[in-house]
Amino acid sequence: MLEQPYLDLAQKVLDEGHFKPDRTHTGTYSIFGHQMRFDLSKGFPLLTTKKVPFGLIKSELLWFLRGDTNIRFLLQHKNHIWDEWAFEKWVASPDYHGPDMTDFGHRSQKDPEFAASYREQMAKFDERILTDESFAAKYGDLGLVYGSQWRAWHTSRGDTIDQLGDVIEQIKTHPYSRRLIVSAWNPEDVPTMALPPCHTLFQFYVNDGKLSLQLYQRSADIFLGVPFNIASYALLTHLVAHECGLQVGDFIHTFGDAHLYVNHLDQIKEQLTRTPRQAPTLVLNPDKHDIFDFDMQDIKLLNYDPYPAIKAPVAV
């Protein structure tokens, strides 16, 4: 089945992973250096051994493609993946006068009373982002995140580079180039970024009328993050191939530190007891050609029949 490389990775980390402390103080079992390969001609690699919310993957990727860095677009599509990073800026500002939200990530997981207050303040924040344009402009923007790095990389000359737009043009005009690369890792920006990019660099490859993509991911949360990453970059491969008039080839996923958090071990073991089902099929709007013009309704998934979702805490 198409998702077997993911299940093999999870089992390998359970069997061979080294225990490491980490930034979140949760603890992980990790391996360093691993590669998975998915033949996209055989289906779309959205996991079936647990339900993965494809709508969130679509809206996040469209957000990146637009070069958008403000969570307002995500909230308009009921996507809360990036809320905490903007909320952190808001509660640390002199304009915030609500209850103390210091270290809200850890406290909300350990203190039920605080968690209720946190949810209330986050709901108020989200609503204000959606309804107050000036507030959204000030506190909804995350700055140098993927959309900015892909579509408007800031140079030392003071201008910007549309890396992804340039690479798509290169695929059309020089498909066999070995420079079809987009990078999100800028050492100058890393100290001030909302979250230094986990998926740091990707490269396209054209052969025999097929487009393949390889992603290098420096840090990978196997249970919660990697299923999203697989589907997101598979979708990106499909979209770029669609615009360039190519078929899809492989998505190759290369990892640096691939890890399972200690508080995800029971969940991944449950997932590994499930037999994978047939992969779904991706359908793109044939009347749209420029990937930067795609909307949510232009991307559809057919025959997705997953097992139920498995909940797990996010390490913060």
Swiss-Prot record:
Subcellular location: Cytoplasm
Catalyzed chemical reaction(s): dUMP + (6R)-5,10-methylene-5,6,7,8-tetrahydrofolate = 7,8-dihydrofolate + dTMP
Binding site for (6R)-5,10-methylene-5,6,7,8-tetrahydrofolate: D221, A315
Pathway entry: Pyrimidine metabolism; dTTP biosynthesis
One Pfam family named in its UniProt record: Thymidylat_synt
GO MF entry, a single one: thymidylate synthase activity
Predominant location: cytoplasm
Entry EC no(s): 2.1.1.45
Keywords: Cytoplasm, Methyltransferase, Nucleotide biosynthesis, Transferase
EC top class, as a word: transferase
Gene Ontology cellular component terms for the protein in this record: cytosol
Biological process annotations from GO: dTMP biosynthetic process; dTTP biosynthetic process; methylation
Domain of life: Bacteria
Record: residues binding dUMP: R23, R178, R179, R218, S219, A220, D221, N229, H259, L260, Y261
Residues at the catalytic site: C198 (nucleophile)
Quaternary structure note: Homodimer.
Role noted for this protein: Catalyzes the reductive methylation of 2'-deoxyuridine-5'-monophosphate (dUMP) to 2'-deoxythymidine-5'-monophosphate (dTMP) while utilizing 5,10-methylenetetrahydrofolate (mTHF) as the methyl donor and reductant in the reaction, yielding dihydrofolate (DHF) as a by-product. This enzymatic reaction provides an intracellular de novo source of dTMP, an essential precursor for DNA biosynthesis.
Family of this protein: Belongs to the thymidylate synthase family. Bacterial-type ThyA subfamily.
Protein name, UniProt field: Thymidylate synthase
Gene: thyA
